[in-house]
Design a protein with these regions (language model features):
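Alpha-helix boundary/interfacial micro-motifs
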Residues: 22-23, 28, 57-58, 208-209
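Bacterial Sec-dependent N-terminal signal peptides
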Residues: 1-32
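Aromatic-patch recognition
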Residues: 37-39, 44-179
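A general boundary/transition motif marking the beginning of the first structured unit of a protein
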Residues: 2-4, 157, 184-188
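C-terminal partner/receptor-binding element of secreted or periplasmic proteins
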Residues: 174-217
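Sec-dependent signal peptide cleavage junction
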Residues: 28-45, 51, 193-194, 205-217
């Protein structure tokens, strides 16, 4: 009886977490002032949002019913919140998942950010298996890519258990020994990922080492 009750509680918790996940995504995809830059050079402006399937729904005016655009024909989008425009690009993780990522730095190594507010991934309490649960703090994932590569890799995360930053960063930036040395000496920690990428793009003696800052956070 206790085991059945325990299983029921786990299922209830998982269902509640998934429901919360859905509403969190919905809340994070409200319509905003949006500008779409297509691969062919076309630019459209209006109000838009990122849909659950990653397409962009854009309304050109109040009378427009809106059109869904395939993310694969879009170079980037700009979403304006509280008068501040942020650039997002559609990328593919090494594990195959696709998502829109906020652009922080573009250069020889580009840095991207993905916020997951209100929920977390980890071990569900009392269940013995991993899944999604509530979180009191937001989780932020940071991704890196070589230049404009479509595929990105997680370099670190904040607010959640992440990869060994020292090992991951040392491997990714192995062509810059001075940076690896700073990471291993803990001069740069995972909280400093912005400075790490900026250092690599501007200080390391590698080809095309330039850095364009798109956002500080």
């Amino acid at each position: 009886m206790n085991s059945q009750k325990h299983l029921f509680n786990n299922k209830t918790f998982l269902f509640s977490s998934l429901l919360f996940f859905f509403f969190a995504l919905t809340a994070n995809s409200q319509k905003q002032i949006c500008k779409i830059y297509f691969d062919d050079g076309t630019v459209l402006s209006g109000t838009g949002k990122i849909r659950m399937d990653n397409s962009i729904k854009l309304k050109l005016n109040e009378n427009d019913k809106g059109t869904d655009y395939d993310p694969l024909i879009i170079d980037r989008i700009e979403l304006e919140t509280d008068g501040i425009s942020q650039v997002y690009k559609y990328k593919k993780e090494v594990d195959g998942f696709h998502k829109w990522l906020k652009v922080l730095i573009e250069g020889k190594v580009s840095l991207y950010k993905y916020d997951m507010s209100g929920f977390n991934f980890g071990t569900i309490p009392g269940s013995g298996f991993s899944g999604m649960g509530m979180a009191s703090t937001p989780v932020t994932y940071y991704y890196v890519a070589r230049g404009e590569d479509f595929e990105v890799s997680i370099i670190t995360s904040l607010g959640n258990i992440s990869k060994n930053f020292k090992k991951t960063a040392s491997d990714y930036f192995k062509d810059c020994p001075v940076l690896v040395e700073k990471v291993n000496a803990k001069e740069f920690k995972k909280d400093d990922i912005f400075q790490v990428v900026k250092f690599y793009n501007t200080k390391c003696e590698t080809e095309n080492a330039t850095s364009v800052i798109k956002a500080e956070n």
